[in-house]
UniProtKB/Swiss-Prot annotation:
It comes from Ruegeria sp. (strain TM1040) (Silicibacter sp.). PROSITE patterns: HISTONE_LIKE. This is Integration host factor subunit alpha. Heterodimer of an alpha and a beta chain. Signal peptide: none annotated. Pfam families: Bac_DNA_binding. One of its GO terms (biological process) is regulation of translation. One of its GO terms (molecular function) is structural constituent of chromatin. Gene3D superfamilies: IHF-like DNA-binding proteins (4.10.520.10). Belongs to the bacterial histone-like protein family.
Length: 100
């Protein structure tokens, strides 16, 4: 399996090639979409992309953790975490891609 990472530039280049917008407009479109998604997540909203998946923010409560080296109990503060749940279609596509 290759270790390729898709970047913003890759996404805007794909929009440029496949949609036909200028490179500048393609980059602006990608930035705008990512900004809208980020803003919604900061507000605690879910971002659902059909046939792809759902991004959401979960609140995790405070708890007591343990230092694995010393065994000492350590308090873990409450926090918000970002989660992604892929759609069934995305799960199937990824699983089918693994069959070589």
């Amino acid at each position: 399996m290759t270790e390729k990472t898709i970047t913003r530039m890759d996404l805007s280049e794909a929009v440029f090639r496949e949609v036909g917008l200028s490179r500048n407009e393609s980059a602006q479109l990608v930035e705008s979409m990512l900004q809208h998604m980020s803003d919604a997540l900061v507000r605690g909203e879910q971002v659902k992309i059909s046939s792809f998946g759902t991004f959401s923010v979960r609140d995790k409560s405070a708890r007591v953790g343990r230092n694995p080296k010393t065994g000492e109990e350590v308090p873990i503060q409450p926090r918000r975490v970002l989660t992604f749940r892929p759609s069934h279609l995305m799960k199937d596509r990824v699983a089918d891609g693994n069959k070589s």
